[in-house]
UniProtKB/Swiss-Prot annotation:
This is Methylenetetrahydrofolate--tRNA-(uracil-5-)-methyltransferase TrmFO. The gene is trmFO. GO terms for biological process: tRNA methylation; tRNA wobble uridine modification. Its EC number is 2.1.1.74. Keywords: Cytoplasm, FAD, Flavoprotein, Methyltransferase, NAD, NADP, Transferase, tRNA processing.
């Protein structure tokens, strides 16, 4: 087990609890990262929040509940060290990390070994989990890249906002591919298009330039932008018309709502998951702060009431093109003895990273016993996130840059309900936002029921094997 962050600590715990001896390697304090300040396992380097703990109405709260049912060390330590934060689960970061460290060091099956792993693990290491996070040391990152290919690791996260499709106003927007081009897997109407007049475009560019931006972290400042990853506000700074000759170009598209008027600019959204519930804003990676992002992007015609599954961002990161490189059990296709977990697999957030460490640990434990473990159902938060990592992205329609990007858990990753709720328990019809609330609650209830069934049918059977 390489890396004692959230994912690595959780994976080691799951393995040990399953009766498997684990050597947990951590390079700190011998080699520190630009962000860590201690050598303690599971140090929280940014926020102290695990976000919403509402399992009935929030996808990350649901993930909390699922992890608790699976005996998560990270959730146990978080619950024991929480601080007041309204409906969120926030923790005292030092006592949280200390609790994780105490549990790991006190487990008879876990050996915590300090020192940097500077290359691929030796061949005799037959069952390895690599969970070294977004700040993986350069020697190990180079070794992984050499084993895969040059484009397998991204060193600058270009994140465009992702919108829930059912919140886009299709009386203003429309489906069409540029020049009606039919690409691989496409239909010729694969993008959602939002038109702008000249006045709307002028106001939009002015808002981008004036919007408050997030500063780079100290360790990010020397990382260059890559071609194709420029923040949208940086493009706007290069010239007033730059965007309408770039990601907002209006050519090859006709607005069926007003076919005689040529839009001055067009914002395109591209399907982001196989289910078709999420669409990303093409070319809209940004360093705008979250508040200004929502305010500015909701001025786009058709997105006035948009709900965002994820807001945009641009920060240094190290993550794998997991759908290409990893199999369904998080093993590297090129060398299946190596399994990956945590943020480097393409999940965002503390809880998400720990949850992928949890499932990686369960997979590795089953493998160590000569057994196999079925994946958790895609209707669960754990299964939905795993599905995104190992294959939930789609190939780009026009051969553009791959669409796989790190993602927080959200209900857009889940399969739709067979039938959405329409009535309250008292029989009266649901109205407006009540429908959204009822839908989320139904998805959460389905997830926990399916997880309990999976635990009974697969996990206990695997544990007994």
């Amino acid at each position: 087990m390489i890396g004692a962050g959230l994912a690595g600590s959780e994976a080691a715990w799951q393995l040990a609890e399953a009766g498997i001896d684990v050597v947990l390697h951590e390079m700190r304090p011998d080699r520190m990262t630009e962000a860590h300040r201690t050598a303690t396992p599971a140090e929280l380097v940014c926020s102290n929040s695990f976000r919403s703990d509402d399992a009935a109405n929030n996808a990350v709260g649901l993930l909390h509940a699922e992890m608790r049912r699976l005996g998560s060390l990270i959730m146990r330590a978080a619950d024991a060290n929480q601080v007041p934060a309204g409906g969120a689960l926030a923790v005292d970061r030092d006592s949280f990390a200390a609790a994780v460290a105490t549990a790991l060091q006190g487990h008879p099956r876990i050996e915590l070994r300090r020192g940097e792993i500077t290359g691929l693990p030796p061949a005799e290491w037959a069952n390895v989990i690599i969970a070294t996070g977004p700040l993986t040391s350069q020697p190990l990152a180079d070794a992984i890249r050499a084993l895969t290919d040059e484009s397998a690791l991204a060193f600058f996260d270009a994140i465009a906002p992702i919108v829930h499709k059912d919140t886009i106003d299709m009386s203003k927007a429309w489906f069409q591919s540029r020049y009606d081009k039919v690409g691989p897997g496409g239909t010729g109407a694969d993008y959602i298009n939002c038109p702008m007049t000249r006045e709307q475009y002028d106001a939009f560019v002015a808002a981008l330039l004036a919007g408050e931006k997030t500063d780079f972290k100290d360790w990010e400042t020397n990382t260059p932008y890559f071609d194709g990853c420029l923040p949208i506000e940086v493009m706007a700074e290069r010239g007033h018309e730059t965007l309408r000759h770039g990601p907002m170009k209006p050519v090859g598209l006709t607005n069926p709502h007003d076919p005689t008027v040529k839009p001055y600019a067009i914002v395109q959204l591209r399907q982001d998951n196989k289910l078709g519930t999420l669409y990303n804003m093409v070319g809209f990676q940004t360093k705008l702060k979250y508040g200004p992002q929502q305010q500015i992007f909701r001025t786009i015609p058709g997105l006035e009431n948009a709900e965002f599954a994820r807001l945009g961002g641009l920060h240094r990161n190290t993550f794998l093109n997991s759908p290409k490189l990893l199999d369904q059990q998080l093993r590297l296709r090129a060398q299946p003895r190596l399994r990956f977990a945590g943020q480097m697999t393409g999940c965002e957030g503390y809880v998400e990273s720990a949850s992928i460490g949890l499932i990686a640990g369960l997979y590795a434990a089953a493998e160590a016993r000569g057994a196999s473990l079925a994946a958790p159902p895609p209707t669960t938060a754990l299964g939905a996130l795993l599905g995104h990592i190992t294959g939930g992205h789609i190939e780009t329609i026009d051969g553009a840059t791959r669409s796989f990007q790190p993602m927080n858990i959200n209900f857009g990753l889940f399969p739709p309900l067979a039938a959405a709720p329409t009535k309250k328990p008292d029989g009266t019809r649901l109205k407006g936002n009540e429908k959204t609330v009822a839908k989320k609650q139904a998805m959460s209830a389905r997830a926990l029921a399916d997880l309990d069934r999976w635990i009974a049918e697969h996990l206990r059977v695997a544990a007994a094997a």
